[in-house]
Each structure stands twice: as structure tokens, then as C-alpha cells.
Amino acid sequence: MNRHMMLGALSCALVAVATCTVLPAMAQEKKPNVVFILADNVGYGDLGPYGGGELRGAATPRIDQLAREGLRLTQYLVEPGCTPSRAALMTGQYSIRNGLSLIIVPGSKSTLSTSAVTMGELFKGAGYATAIFGKWHLGAEPQSLPTAHGFDEFYGIPPDISWDSATYVDTITLTHSMNVPPDELLAKGPQIVEAVAGGPLRTVKPFTREVRAEIDDELVAKSTDFMKRQKAAGKPFFLYLPFSMGHFPNLPSKQFAGKSRIGQYGDKLMEGDHHVGQILDTLKELGVDDDTLVVFASDNGPQGETSREMGNQGTPDMGNSGPFRGELGEATEGSIRTFCIVRWPGKVKPGTSSYAMFSTMDFFPTFARLIGTKVPTDRPIDGVDQTDVLLGKSETGNRDSLLSFIGADMVAARWKQWRMYFTDVQPTGIGPQRQPGMFSSSAPMAGYPKIYNIEMDPHEDLQVATLFGWTVGPMIEVVEKYKETLEQYPNPPAGNLTKF
């Protein structure tokens, strides 16, 4: 046990016996660097290793290479939207346990609490240098900032908004919605910000459409500089790079504008592929690629898939859910199932795939195991340790179920290959006003849930409750186990934008 692990174990034993559990590290091996690259609204069927890429009109050669050198998770499950999925990833908990089960928008009160324990804190406590460059989207209150939750450095968009905020000033000016001079409006609009641990947010420059188009170049440059500094200092690092690849409006950089055959969304996919390659090249140049675990995943399904099914082929940011139904904001398989590739030379077998059910929450305890640090025991941790899946020692993993929430509602459950819906999520409006995805409405089912077999029917076209009603029992058991945890650990108020 090295010095950091010994101090962590002693601290856990002497200071917080009731609040943490130390997971066994991998037999006295050197701690790996960890790089987690998170795409935004990129669908299961968008990239080459999952049936997209060149076939879809946007080649992704560096991502294809990453898959050849690592492990493809083919049943990687997330939450239905940006904020919920990022909250689940960072805390190892269902987003509703932190009141973050709706996408944060400007003016909403949802924000990450002081008591939350994040992945940044896991790594920081294990002696890692930590940084996030890009989109946090878990709140901008001082107690919610990434630098208040274990990250040494942050550079990106405001922590309570998303990439589309680059259009706010333009749309306000166009509609004359505010009686504010343009220059003053620009100064008051969204800003690129930065912070270091213990310090406040500092404004860098306005976040305009022009900045939006080139922002990922900046984020990768910041990431490269961070890794070089930590290599020089001889310190292990955790780099979290939630960049803009896939999120509307997909304004490509000048280098990639017009490169794909499918418009700006494809251009941005190709640009993102280039940036993934830059990160991999930097690791190799630094001589740390064999010592670095790289994860590349998406936060949720794409925008626009349901619009395509309704006959709208003109959405410029329309992604592809592959064989699955649904999109960003729903609880359908196409919303919560997306790609994830893991590479760790010498540890993760190259050119492999796993069908084990793997939740984004599972990275929290899995990373804790790999770096020999602690996970909290004073709260439910919904993630499970999936180290054996990553290392090829288990085909099935430690998970066979998952719940899905939207706002205050538990809307669906997965158990093995079965999906059960407790609410009926449908697009709102009719005709041109028909809005799917995150603008859908939900209504309670009239007594019985909908049930689908995802393996036989990935598009969820055929309800099978009549033939397979027995599956309700195991899924209700999953629900009841979750409800039991609420007796000791009740959830805070869920995100809400419609019920006052």
C-alpha cells in the first residue's frame, strides 16, 4: 500500500468509519492516469465502431482506432438528459438523489449540493491532479462549482448552462426581447469562465457563436497543457473533458466546416474525432499511454431521432440512435443507451466488446477500486464495481437492472432485456407544434405498465405484457429496493419547471 492509499485508509478508519468504504486497489500496481472524454447528445448509431461513421457520412477514423485498441460497451446506459446524466456520472447515484433529474436551464434552482461527493473528490483524495475543461452543467452556485467538488482547475462555459447559450444574445437582439444596448447585452450574456480550487469564477470572454465554433480547440489545448504539466510534476492525473461534440447548435470550426456529407452535425462528429485523436497523440508523446485509462462516451442519446420518425428530415443537429427508439429527454432505449469505449493498454484487451449492462454510475465505484480510494457509505451509491467487465474477467458484470427518472417521476425500469414503462411519454402538440424528446409530456399508465423485450424488439414497437407479464415481478422488486433506501435517505425536491 503506498503512502496516499495508507493515508486514505487511516483517514477512513479514524475519521469517518461510518461514512466511507475503501475498495481494494489492484495489487499494489501503479495508479493509472484517467482521461474521461464526454461527447454531448451523440447517439448510439453515430460513430464508426457502432455502425455509423463513414456509413453515416462522417468518418471517425481515430475513434475507430480507439475501439480497435480497447473495449466497446454495447449496453452502456445513462440518464435521459445532460444534467441528470452528468450528475449520475459524477456522484455514482441516480440524479434524483441530488435533485438533478431535469436539465438545468437559466433561472432554475437546481444545483449540486455541498454534501454531494463527486468523482473529482475521489481522485483528489487519492493524490491526483484533477481538471475539467468544458461543460459542468450541475449548477453555478459557489457550492456547486467543480472547483468546490475536487477539481483543481476548470475552464469552460458557465456551470449552469449548455452550448446553445452561445445563441442567447443573438436571439434576444433579433426579437427585441430586452431593452438593452447590444454591447451591454454582450457583456451581460453568457461568458467563458475559469476557476481554480478555492477561488471564484473568473470571466474570460463572451461566449458568442464565433467562440462556440472554435471552443473545442481551446478545451483540447487546455487539456494537453494540463497533462504535460502533471507529467513534468510526476503526478497522476484525472482529466474530465466534457466537450461540445454533438450538442446543438453544432457550429463546426473553420477547419471542419463542410467536411462531412451530412451537414453541420457530421462536421462536428469529424471534428470531435480529430480532437479525440489529439488527446491520444498527447498521451503517446508524453510516454504515458500505457499508464492511462481512457474512456470516451456520450452523456445521452441524440436530438432529433423522433423528429425523423415523424417525417422531419431537416433538423441540422439530428443524431442517430441506431436500432433504438427515442432521443434526448425521453426514457426510451435510444435516449439512455449510447456508446462507450474504454482503452487501457496491457489491462483492457484490445478489439473486444461487452454486452454486460453498464451504467454511467458504475464508473464511480469502479474508478474507486482501480485507484484504491474510498466510496461514501453515508448515502446510497447506485453504481456497482465493474472492474471485472473492463478487465475481461466477467461477461455479465454486476448489474442487471436500472431505473429511469424524469423530474420527480420514475418513468421506467430495466431488468435484464426487459423494459417496463410506468408513465406514457409522448410528444406534445400536433402537426408543426409536435415536440418530442425533452419537450415530451408524460401521463400515468392506467393500471398496468408497458413492457418491451429490448433484445427481440430494440425499437420498442411491440408491447408484450400479455405474454410476459411475469417480468413485472422482478422489476417491481427493483423498484421496491430503491424505495426502501428512501426511508433512511429521502431525496431532495426534484427539478421542476412546470408545477408551481
Task: Map each language-model feature to its residues.
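Formylglycine-dependent sulfatase
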Residues: N2, L7-A16, A25-M445, P449, ...
